[in-house]
Amino acid sequence: MNTIDKIFNYNRQPNISPFFKEKLVELISFGTYHNDIEKIRDGIVQELVNYREKYKITNVVIGMSGGLDSALTASLYKTAGYHVIGVTLPIHQNPDETARGVEAINALGLDHKHIDLSNQYDFVVADTISNFGDTSIGNDDRATAMRRGNIRARLRMITLYNLAGKYKGFVASTDNFSELAAGFWTLHGDVGDVAPIQSLTKSWEVPAMAELQGVPSSTIQAVPTDGLGIANGDEDQFGFSYLEFDIALFTLIKNLSLANATESDLKIIDSVKSRVRNSGYKRSNPYNLLHPMFPARFGELEILDEQL
């Protein structure tokens, strides 16, 4: 199976438009879709080993959603010699998602904790209505669904950080590069302390590395969801696939020609532009203002960090 066929297979997508296929071929030739996944994996694992040795922290807590990203993240920490605690945290969740999380935990040989947060979530939503009079929190529109999704993400992160404190460890981030660019995460929610796969593309490097790491095929082939109840899946929110998102993103990053793009192709390109532009504030959070008199203070503190 050649690289393009592998990419289509990982993305459950038999084909893409001629323009997007043309750009994919260009990106493969540039090395953006690099074949040496093992070398990339080894580099990430070494960085995780370096972090463990520098800070003397061996325990890591990971929310196991049943998705590919959390399973790959857990496997990389395991390979790097960490004690990994995988936590399933359903909130009115599809049982299949939780079952996949448990399957990945067992396949990777992780410790498992299970905490159903559905009652806590219901209490927060009900309390928001009763104490603040915010009846709109129950609306069915997309914006309100995102607010409720953010409550889910932040409840999970409170729980994960509490466990990390118990085990004197830290919380892993599980977001990938595509999610980073799209703004597909909750500030102070489904993020953590160390992000091993945040530089990896969802359409290629994440599934290819997961296969290399022995992540169950049922997880690799599962439709990507955020577990926040916002839509039927990540790609449902996009209106197109992660593969098309990644190709469009790198077409913009590398300033490739749009000469052969159809109107439908350009709609995807414009949608990606909009998502990246509108989520920039999240990638710069917290936005630290420089001291008006002593603008070098942050840099001086970074130097001290390195010295110590």
Q: Model-found features: residue ranges?
A:
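Short glycine-/acidic-enriched loop or helix-start segments at secondary-structure transitions
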Residues: 72, 98, 124, 181-184
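Conserved G/P- and acidic residue-centered "switch" motifs that form tight phosphate/ATP-binding loops
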Residues: 67
